[in-house]
């Protein structure tokens, strides 16, 4: 999943929240992030409204990132060009005992990204790689 959390009273706005959470969870210093803007709000399965904020960092910043052990298992990159590939996103439908589930899976290297994170990436993909007329 992506770094994130609740708006705290100390946060000026949702961008400040995103930057604070990224610093707390993966040691990403706010000063090295170029904020590009927000994506569409997404409702989590628990009913929370999540406002994704998109930022860009330089490649050399990745080596400085450190996961907060109590919150983050690992940190990995997903090249933007990977989002444009037709085989990256898969729509999965699973039948459960009492209901069916449908969700996106983003396949990348040793990681499968799914759920809310995959929905956010799908929104980003649709904005970056819109069909040309």
PLM feature spans:
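Unchanged
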Residues: 6-113, 122-133
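Active-site-proximal cofactor/substrate-binding loop regions of enzyme domains
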Residues: 2
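NAD(P)-dependent dehydrogenases' Rossmann-like dinucleotide-binding region
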Residues: 117
């Amino acid at each position: 999943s992506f770094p994130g959390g609740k708006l705290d009273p100390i946060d000026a706005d949702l961008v400040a929240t995103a930057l604070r959470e990224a610093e707390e969870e993966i040691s990403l210093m706010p000063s090295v992030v170029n904020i590009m803007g927000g994506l569409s709000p997404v409702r989590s399965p628990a009913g929370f409204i999540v406002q994704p904020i998109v930022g860009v960092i330089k490649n050399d910043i990745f080596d400085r990132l450190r996961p907060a052990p109590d919150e983050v298992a690992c940190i990995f990159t997903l090249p933007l060009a990977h989002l444009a590939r037709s085989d990256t996103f898969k729509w999965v439908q699973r039948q459960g005992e009492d209901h069916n589930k449908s969700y996106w899976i983003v396949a990348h290297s040793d990681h499968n990204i799914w759920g809310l994170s995959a929905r956010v990436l799908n929104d980003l993909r649709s904005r970056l790689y819109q069909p040309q007329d």
